[in-house]
Amino acid sequence: GASGLISFPRV
């Protein structure tokens, strides 16, 4: 989950 951006998977 990237803040302010599209939700990306945190790895």
Curated annotation (Swiss-Prot):
Its main location: secreted. InterPro entries: Periviscerokinin (IPR013231). It is found in: Secreted. Pfam families: Periviscerokin. GO terms for cellular component: extracellular region. One of its GO terms (biological process) is neuropeptide signaling pathway. Signal peptide: none annotated. The keyword Glycosyltransferase does not apply. Keywords: Amidation, Neuropeptide, Secreted. The modification Valine amide is found at residue 11. Belongs to the periviscerokinin family. Mediates visceral muscle contractile activity (myotropic activity). According to PubMed:19808072, a longer form of this peptide exists. This is Periviscerokinin-2. It comes from Bisanthe pulchripennis.
